[in-house]
Amino acid sequence: IRINSLNIDFTDKVVLDIGCNAGGILFNIQDKVKYGLGVDYDYKIINFANKVAKTEKYNNLDFYTVDLNSDNFSVINNYSDQEQKFDVIFLLAVCMWIDTWEELIEWTRKNCEVCVFETNGKPKQQDKQLAKLQQVYNSVELINDNSADDDFYLRNDIQGAKRKNHPLRKLYICR
C-alpha cells in the first residue's frame, strides 16, 4: 500500500530500508534499484529475507541484523558496498521502537537525498516525529495521511479507545 503512493523513480538508485522486516519493500523494487540494503534488529526475519534474495537471485540486495538501540548508526555504512550516500532511505513506522530516534533522523539527513518516513506511535509521538523532520529537512511533504501496511489500520470500524491505541500513521517524503 505504502510504496504505491510514492512518486519516486527507483531506477539505478541506492536504497536503504531501516526496519526492513522481511524485505518486502526492497523485493518490490529490486528490479529497478542499483543496490538495496535492508537492516532490522530481528535476525530471524533477516535470515528469511536473505533466503528469499538468494533463492530469487536478487544479487543487488543485502540484508543485515542491526540493533539501532545498541549499535552506532554508522555501522550501516559499513554494510553498504556503495561509497556514496544513499539516494533513498526508508524509515517506515520504526521510530517509536528506537530510543535515539531523533539522532537517527539527523543521521538519515546526512546520508541520503530522499527519506521516505512513516510516523508511528501515539498522536503525541507522531507529532514529535513530524516536528523533528521539519527541523532537519528542507522539505517535508505529506504523501498519505492514512498510511499502513496492515489493513487493520485502515478499517473504518475502529473507533474510540481502539483507534486511540492504533492511530493512523502518516507517510512523508523528506528532502
Describe the function of each predicted region.
Residues I1-D12:
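Conserved alpha-helix/loop element of class I SAM-dependent methyltransferases that forms part
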Residues K13-N21:
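Conserved class I S-adenosyl-L-methionine
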Residues A22-V33:
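Conserved SAM-binding loop of SAM-dependent methyltransferases across substrates and taxa
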Residues D42:
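Conserved SAM/SAH-binding beta-strand->alpha-helix loop
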Residues A49-N50:
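Conserved SAM-binding loop
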Residues Y58-N69:
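Conserved SAM-binding strand-loop segment of SAM-dependent methyltransferases
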Residues D87-T100:
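A short SAM/SAH-binding and catalytic strip from SAM-dependent methyltransferases
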Residues C112-P123:
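Conserved beta-strand signature within the Rossmann-like core of class I S-adenosyl-L-methionine
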